[in-house]
Amino acid sequence: MNQPIHNAYWLTRFDSILDSALAQHRAISLIRVDLRFPEYMPATIMDTDLDSAVISRFFESLKAKIQAYQRKKRCANQRVHATSLGYLWCREFGKMYGRKHYHVILLLNKDTWCSLWDFTVSSSLATLIQEAWCSALRIEPWLGDGLVHFSRWTPSRKPTSPAAPPSSDDTPLPSGCSDTRKASDKKSGGSAVLWVTRGDKEAVQKALERARYLVKNETKLHDGSGQRNYGCSRGPGRLLDGR
């Protein structure tokens, strides 16, 4: 089977975003998340085929929620670690049903969030991401179950032995809370959160491998609609510190 053909331009853009994040922070948390649409959404709320601004609304909402989280900590006299929000996204369509969805990489200060926690904790990063996506979709948060999907990364390779578990590009983790589980409960492969420390070349290469999955040309739609298949943050980015 041929390897996916990657978009070199967007891979270079991601490399630049990663460099900017590491220039601002000693270490970052890289998070892979899939954003999906409800199977049925009344056109009076949003036409998912035409509304290309939904992904922009997601990032604006997430920034606002991070600021509110930081402000709450500051008001409680808790230590606040400022964070930028770097990101890369791609728009894809499922092979079987052709349903539109987004794959996203988020880059945040590791001192601010080193894990996702889970959806049962109102202040967790997982919850903030889900609420931001619901806000972008203009639906109530309680309707967001199953629409935000965090993934565990396993490099594409053949099993080293017949007993080895099969590999896949992205394998789901329940509740997106890989970093809060006991070691005995963890599956093989990398977690939903990748830590990248400044100067760690091996971790940088792992980050680029995750980005390559997003920038493959397969499953992208080129229909002349004018809607973008890719997007990313620009420059170093504003520090979100609750002020």
Task: Show where each model-derived region lies.
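Solvent-exposed loop and beta-edge segments used for protein-protein assembly and interaction
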Residues: 25-27, 81, 96-98
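Residues that flank catalytic or metal-binding motifs in active/ligand-binding sites
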Residues: 29, 85, 100, 210
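Short N-terminal edge-element motif at the start of the domain
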Residues: 39-95
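Histidine-centered divalent-metal-coordination microenvironment in nucleic-acid enzymes
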Residues: 86-113
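Catalytic "initiation/cleavage/transfer" segments centered on a nucleophilic residue
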Residues: 1-25, 110-243
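Active-site-flanking beta-strand signature of metal-NTP-handling nucleotidyl enzymes
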Residues: 28-40
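A short, flexible beta-alpha/helix-coil linker loop
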Residues: 38-42, 109-114
